[in-house]
Amino acid sequence: MNEQYSALRSNVSMLGKVLGETIKDALGENILDRVETIRKLSKSSRAGNEANRQELLTTLQNLSNDELLPVARAFSQFLNLANTAEQYHSISPQGEAASNPEVIARTLRKLKDQPNLDEATIKNAVESLSLELVLTAHPTEITRRTLIHKMGEVNACLKQLDNKEIADYERNQLMRRLRQLIAQSWHTDEIRKNRPSPVDEAKWGFAVVENSLWEGVPNYLRELNEQLEEHLGYKLPVDFVPVRFTSWMGGDRDGNPNVTADVTRHVLLLSRWKATDLFLKDIQVLISELSMVDATPELLALVGEEGASEPYRYLMKSLRSRLMATQAWLEARLKGEKLPKPAGLLTQNEQLWEPLYACYQSLQACGMGIIANGELLDTLRRVKCFGVPLVRIDIRQESTRHTEALGELTRYLGIGDYESWSEADKQAFLIRELNSKRPLLPRQWEPSDDTREVLETCQVIAEAPLGSIAAYVISMAKTPSDVLAVHLLLKEAGISFAMPVAPLFETLDDLNNADAVMTQLLNIDWYRGFIQGKQMVMIGYSDSAKDAGVMAASWAQYQAQDALIKTCEKAGIELTLFHGRGGSIGRGGAPAHAALLSQPPGSLKGGLRVTEQGEMIRFKYGLPEVTISSLSLYTGAILEANLLPPPEPKNSWRHIMDELSVISCDLYRGYVRENKDFVPYFRSATPEQELGKLPLGSRPAKRRPTGGVESLRAIPWIFAWTQNRLMLPAWLGAGTALQKVVEDGKQSELEAMCRDWPFFSTRLGMLEMVFSKADLWLAEYYDQRLVKKALWPLGEELRNLLAEDIKVVLAIANDSHLMADLPWIAESIQLRNVYTDPLNVLQAELLHRSRLAEEQGKDPDPRVEQALMVTIAGVAAGMRNTG
């Protein structure tokens, strides 16, 4: 066991040593000694030494304002380096995931061993694989892009240092490079000065494509193909690419007034520009490689006499010219110039595919398969995965914005107020207009700014090249009219094809009602005819957990999916469930494999569509090798879930879940909504108010500027509780409900559910993960430094609940300690705690100083404010998630 981690630990300590040298060079021996003392005290405090724990608190409380920032930065940067070492370890020869392509091999072996599955069935399941990853900017990646880039280089150095064969002088050069990179990071401000704009966020997404996915996706497909050949004797067709990427950056306007129609238009152009740029580099390589002369008569006919001497190069050069002309036109459009479209402007993937595929077929036919299956095949696969748009965009808007727009229109037309109509009247009006051949919008109408924005967004969708917009997502969808309203607005903008419109059900009531809403829609003749047998529905994880607590929310999500699957199956509709999961447990995050196998049977038949959020994008797709690993995990899980679906839960299990759901939701809401002390306690015990100052994402933290917990977005709500280590949204109510069911004599039933039902065992596993990141003494310390004494009893009550919850979960799982079955994660959390603890203590101290200055009417000390921001970023790195 320790053998496996010794490589990780030695890398972590080596990087820590280099960081120490950097700090000493920059700030002198005294600061380094101070940091080292704090680290040793923290380590000893973690090992249970109470005297050292007290000394740690005293030392951090007594830091001068000048010492605050260097100490905070030292621990924060160390955690970034530890995360980098861990990410490298996951793909290194010593790491557990060295075998990640092995995941696919393991899955294929497991499937072949099933007596009821033949190879043809497995092959069909492979051919219907579909994985769409939707990159979102929230909760925002807290680490700056420039530092991410440096950490990527540190990773590359670790990889080369792992090679035992390298000469001493090369090793010395690599160590010098590591020192340079760590010094560069130390002398770079880790906190952004300004909030990123939606366009900046989109560029961050494009950088992930360029630096990692562009190389990672073809390599993943190569790996998948090799495993399929070996285990099934089956080769992937050239045009088969089961993975696609979509983005919300620049398209998600829900609660973000900064994402306008103009911004979306700009991001669509920028995305196409980036695609031409990346394909030009590919084509340049192909021009240099494809110098061959032999070609089929078909290819020679295509190039004519002029290209006969080097037919492949000739075709590639003409494709290069088209790419360059397209890029120049896009560049002019981005600068605001109106130019006529050039002949041969690339707007569809086929225009890229055809010349490349013609070369591929000719090379294969002329016995040059080895060449065809090199760079050329990679480029063909990139055309299928990324294509002309690079990433497609989802548009997301809140349902009330569409209702308000139609209300304004009907009032102008003098036919009443749509907003105040009953649901039946709204539906009758919408269906009548959807069936009508005449336009609804009067030319002379001057709508309000908000309504104009909604209409212009639909206009942008109508103008965009076919295939560049993936779906229109309606957040806070509650009724059939919410869906029909969007279809009508799109029709009025001139969109004639069946653009996927996905209602997002995200509160407990809406999830419970989702099946009824979709059943009503599918009973409408116009609707059934229009959607052509396909429906997408999005399931909201974060808002439902914030609304009802994690246990009730996860059961409502399961039941909603289960009912929708059955309804669509009966109606002959192909359903795609779109999962709006976050990286953190309170927002539905779970290790991919476990999460997918815990869904209802049949939930992945229409493929997997899932959001990949801000900081998780870097952990899962930050490097090409990590991308291969993540995509392989998803592939294995989807195949397994479709061919060996989890069992239907027994009725008695469903009853127990209903019971757990009611008890946990009552307890959760009893605190969060009904306890008058809760909101003041939350505001003072966590850095919730200070988080708003962090220039994180382009989106405001609240849907409405005033208001309590209910108006706070799910992300800052979870981020705040993660910072003070109480992790409350991810467990409150769950353990109490389990305890009650145990007291009712059902422990053996719970143990059976844990053993035989992936949904339930994943829930408990996620609770264990949260418990191992939560910390009772730190949460108590925040109370002592920041909370009025009158509110201390509430904090104590919550911590007692947490301690009880941990005992209950361990009893049901039959374990003596947390994460017993995932030692690798337990090890990783332990490793980071030594560095995260001082940041937490320091953060509480900084919050205390900052709030005291505010109470005394003094200006905040910039050193305190800056150090506070650094601790927030550092704790996020230590917890491996923001919100």
Curated annotation (Swiss-Prot):
Any coiled-coil regions, as ranges: none
EC number: 4.1.1.31
Xref: InterPro entries: PEP_COase, PEP_COase_bac/pln-type, PEP_COase_Lys_AS, PEPCASE_His_AS, Pyrv/PenolPyrv_kinase-like_dom
Disulfide bond sites: none
Name of the top EC class for this enzyme: lyase
Superkingdom of the organism of origin: Bacteria
Entry annotation: catalytic residues: H138, K546
Keyword Transcription (UniProt): no
Gene Ontology BP, a term: oxaloacetate metabolic process
The keyword Nucleotidyltransferase is assigned to this record: no
GO cellular component terms attached to this protein's record: cytosol
Cofactors demanded by this protein: Mg(2+)
Any one Gene Ontology molecular-function term assigned to this protein's record: phosphoenolpyruvate carboxylase activity
Pfam families with a match to the protein in the record: PEPcase
Keywords carried by this UniProt record: Carbon dioxide fixation, Lyase, Magnesium
Catalytic reaction annotation: oxaloacetate + phosphate = phosphoenolpyruvate + hydrogencarbonate
Family: Belongs to the PEPCase type 1 family.
Listed NCBIfam families: PRK00009.1
Summary of the function given for this chain in its UniProt record: Forms oxaloacetate, a four-carbon dicarboxylic acid source for the tricarboxylic acid cycle.
Name listed for the protein in its UniProt record: Phosphoenolpyruvate carboxylase
Record organism: Citrobacter koseri (strain ATCC BAA-895 / CDC 4225-83 / SGSC4696)
Organism lineage string: Bacteria, Pseudomonadati, Pseudomonadota, Gammaproteobacteria, Enterobacterales
